[in-house]
Amino acid sequence: MEHERRGVTRYNFGAIAEVVDLDGRGEVVSLTRDFSYSGAFVKTTTPLPTGTRVRVRITHSGAEFAATGNVTGNVIPTGMGIVFTEIEASDRAILERWLGVQS
């Protein structure tokens, strides 16, 4: 099932997510709940603070996607939203493949 939030379609998407605080204050390894071209929601009971700059690595079906982003908000106790701010072209291609976009 897909749904729209903030003008971006979000897709239910369960994958392994590693979120690393770029200031070295912590790391979360968990699962994504939903995913879009602009961000993801990561399930965790210990979210990083809003505004934290992070490196996200998501693994699904043998492929790995990476991006830099910011924590946009916390939903205690379910997780944190992350907006992607930097995505390399090769990672963008993986994202498009996962979400079903034809190039």
What are these regions (language model features)?
Residues 1-35, 96-103:
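N-terminal helix initiation/capping motif
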Residues 8, 43-47:
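Short, surface-exposed secondary-structure edge patches
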Residues 15-21, 51-64:
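Short conserved beta-strand and strand-loop elements enriched in small hydrophobics
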Residues 22-24, 37, 74-79:
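Short, conserved beta-turn/loop elements at beta-strand boundaries and strand-helix junctions
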Residues 30, 67-72:
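Short beta-strand-centered aromatic/proline hotspots
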Residues 41-44, 77-86:
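Short, solvent-exposed secondary-structure boundary/capping segments
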Residues 89-93:
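Short, charged/polar, Gly/Pro-enriched secondary-structure boundary elements
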